[in-house]
Amino acid sequence: MISVYGSTGFIGSHYCDLYNDNVIRINRNTRDPQSKDILYFISTVTNYNVFDNPHLDINTNLNVLVQTLESCRKKYDSDFTFNFISSWFVYGKSTLPAKESSSCNPKGFYSITKLAAEQLLISYCETYGINYRILRLCNVYGVGDKKSSKKRNALQHLATEVVRGHNINLYNDGKDIRDFMHVKDVCRAIDCVINCGEINDTYNIGSGQPNNFFELMSYVKQKTKSDSKFKSVEPPHFHKVVQAQDMFLDITKLKQLGFKQQISIHQGLDEIIETIN
């Protein structure tokens, strides 16, 4: 059994539903683990928190992590494995495809605290002799994300707008590159790393395929015969400062574990379209 922290979030809830017989959902108000295998999803999800609550990323991504590590250590000493969900945001602007060994140069509060959390985790685990794994996720999409917006799960948000015939704005002619993976495939990849991955190691989780927003939204428009029009706009200054324009991941290590993606990007978009219709 694996104790899942952050089981009510978009990815965490999908993971728990997919592997229901093997998970213990940890209440958000407690840090007490119920098994020696830990899967940790708790995190903020955007760099924009700095405008409303600059302490949120630090408190959530660092303080809560330390509290959880302490609870696990006090209960199990060093006899547990901590699987930490991180993000491609830690890379910042990087040579592509980004490898686990690539240098990290994050700029935003969220991105910086995710990298700091990785380093804190490694230091803590090495200090106490605890096993860990770090999983850096690509852009995760799929139906069921009630908080999707231009800043989070933008693919679902934009696809929804196109299906409904609304005009959309695309940064840089929609040519920004991202690595998208359906949430169910992401959960399968996470489970693959947990069961087959080396301990004390880092893994990229993604499709390994570069896609841009213009081509994907054009597919949605053609598929639904939408009247939506696309307008190219200049990204806000803050977006250009904290966000890499292009990103996709090298998933060689994930493939070596035997993982194979099951849902193509077009199949995932078709699912979104069907849900909206």
Task: List where the protein language model places each region.
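N-terminal Rossmann NAD(P)H-binding glycine-rich loop of SDR-like oxidoreductase domains
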Residues: 1-20
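C-terminal substrate-binding subdomain of Rossmann-fold SDR/epimerase-dehydratase oxidoreductases
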Residues: 162-277
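NAD(P)H-binding glycine-rich loop region in Rossmannoid oxidoreductase-like domains
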Residues: 31-60
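Conserved beta-loop-beta element that borders a ligand/cofactor-binding pocket
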Residues: 86-87, 119-144, 169
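Active-site helix of classical SDR
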Residues: 113-116
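Flexible, glycine-rich beta-alpha linker
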Residues: 91-92, 108-109, 133-153
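Conserved catalytic-core motifs of eukaryotic protein kinase domains, centered on the activation segment
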Residues: 48-56, 93-97, 146-147
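Conserved Rossmann-fold NAD(P)-dependent oxidoreductase catalytic core, especially the SDR/UDP-sugar
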Residues: 66-109, 133
